[in-house]
């Protein structure tokens, strides 16, 4: 039963990697979220776009959910996308038909199908990738990047695993043999 004026002990922030860089304007961003993994991106995007001088960085947010009713902050992100030409909001709904008529899928399916929208972004030296949400997203995105030849900037594969085809990777093996580089930040659970 705390009373006004009582002292409390707090800690944090606990993370050291899942933050915007010190000079955010020097980077472009691919932000990948599933479910409640959207929460840190809302804060990052607000910091980038609602600053006195909004960021000119290219920012792509891909939000994956089972149903459209699960799209957290959807109106907020759609409004930002209509107000800032450098902010792009993409939704992936796994258990419904997509707006383009494609079947539902996961974030890695979307990125693979729409690679023409993201290949240039992923090929830039200034791009950072952030993933927050379900751990299954990490496996799918890592495999897609490696299969598309985009993984070198974002993934470090241990030498004794380099000959294994990405299609054969599984969640156990990526934890053991595949690490994100300094350009790929993960917060998966």
Where are these regions (language model features)?
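Ser/Thr-glycine-rich phosphate-binding loops at phosphate-binding pockets of nucleotides
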Residues: 34-40
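Short, flexible hinge/linker loops that cap or flank conserved catalytic cores
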Residues: 22-25, 53, 122-123
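Reductase modules of NAD(P)H-dependent flavoproteins
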Residues: 60-189
């Amino acid at each position: 039963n705390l009373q006004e004026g009582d002292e409390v002990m707090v800690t944090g922030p606990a993370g050291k990697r899942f933050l915007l860089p010190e000079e955010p304007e020097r980077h472009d961003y691919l932000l990948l979220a599933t479910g409640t993994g959207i929460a840190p991106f809302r804060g990052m995007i607000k910091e980038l776009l609602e600053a006195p001088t909004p960021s000119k960085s290219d920012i792509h947010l891909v939000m994956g959910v089972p149903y459209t009713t699960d799209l957290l902050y959807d109106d907020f992100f759609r409004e930002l996308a209509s107000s800032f030409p450098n902010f792009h909001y993409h939704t992936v709904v796994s258990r419904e038909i997509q707006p383009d008529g494609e079947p539902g899928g996961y974030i890695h399916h979307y990125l693979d199908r729409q690679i023409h929208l993201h290949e240039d972004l992923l090929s830039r030296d200034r791009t950072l990738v952030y993933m927050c949400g379900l751990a299954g997203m990490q496996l799918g995105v890592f495999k897609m990047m490696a299969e598309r030849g985009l993984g070198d900037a974002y993934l470090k594969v241990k030498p004794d695993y380099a000959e294994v085809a990405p299609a054969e990777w599984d969640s156990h093996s990526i934890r053991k043999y595949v690490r994100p580089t300094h350009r790929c930040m993960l917060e998966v659970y």
